[in-house]
From Swiss-Prot:
It comes from Clostridioides difficile (strain 630). This is Energy-coupling factor transporter ATP-binding protein EcfA1. Residues 5-242 form the ABC transporter domain. Pfam families: ABC_tran. Coiled coil: none annotated. Belongs to the ABC transporter superfamily. Energy-coupling factor EcfA family. The keyword Nucleotide-binding applies. It is an enzyme of class 7 (translocase). Forms a stable energy-coupling factor (ECF) transporter complex composed of 2 membrane-embedded substrate-binding proteins (S component), 2 ATP-binding proteins (A component) and 2 transmembrane proteins (T component).
Amino acid sequence: MDNIVKVNNISFEYITDEAKLKAIDNLSLDVKKGEFVAIIGHNGSGKSTLSKNLNAILMPTEGNILIDDMDTKEEERLWDIRQTAGMVFQNPDNQIVATIVEEDVAFGPENLGIEPKEIRRIVEESLKSVGMYDLRDRQPHLLSGGQKQRVAIAGIIAMRPKCIIFDEATAMLDPSGRKEVMKTIKRLNKEENITVIHITHFMEEAVEADRVVVMEKGKKILEGTPREVFSKIKMLKEIGLDVPCMTELSSLLIEEGINISSDILTVDEMVMELCQL
C-alpha cells in the first residue's frame, strides 16, 4: 500500500527573541493511503505542531514532508497540498466563513472555479456524508458544537481530499458532539477510504484507529496498534497520559486477583470477558 504522507526526519523550532524552542525533534512517520492514525501526547508534546507541518501551515526547520509525493516546502504546490490533505481545527467557529450552512460548504469549490451546477452536487454530497443535509439552510451560529464541526468537515470533504487531518477537532465538544464527529470520521475512513490523521487527547478516540503514535518532547516514542500501545500502561502514565477506561479497569481487577485479559480496550470487550468468568 502506498504512503500518502511521508515525514522524513523533521525538526521544527519556534524562535522568539529570548530563545529557540524545539517542538519537533528528528521525527519520521509514514501514513498509508486509507489508514486511520491517531497521534496522542500531553500538552507540549509536539502533536499539534506536527499537524500544522503536515498541512504546510508551518514548515520544518530540518527534514521534509511529502504529501502524496508533493514536498510541503514547494510554494507552488501549496494549494494542491492543502486540497489533498485537508485540515479540521479545534474550534469550528474559526473555520466557518459563511452565514448559511450550504454556502459555507460551497466556499472551497467556488474558489477552485468549479461550475455552479457541479458545486451544488458536491455540496449536497458533502453535507449528506456528514448527516447535515437537512440543516443546509440553517445559520451556523444556531447549530450545536458537534453540528458545527460536521459542517467544517463537510467543507473539507467538498474539496475532495485524499487525507483529512483532525487537530483536536473534538476537544471543545461535549460527549454527544464528540460521538457525532467520531462517527463521521470513522465512516469517511471506512466507507470512502479517506486517510485520517487524528490528533487527540481522548484515549477512547485513539482506540478507534488502525495505529496509534505517541509523542513526547517532540519525538515519536511509541507506535503500534491500539492494543499494543495501551498495553504499556506504566510507560504512558510516566509521561502523563491516561489509558482507556476499560484498560485501566482491567488492570485494577487483575491486581485484585481476577483472571481477565490485560489488553481490554472497550466496554463490549470487558462485558464479554466478565461473562466468561
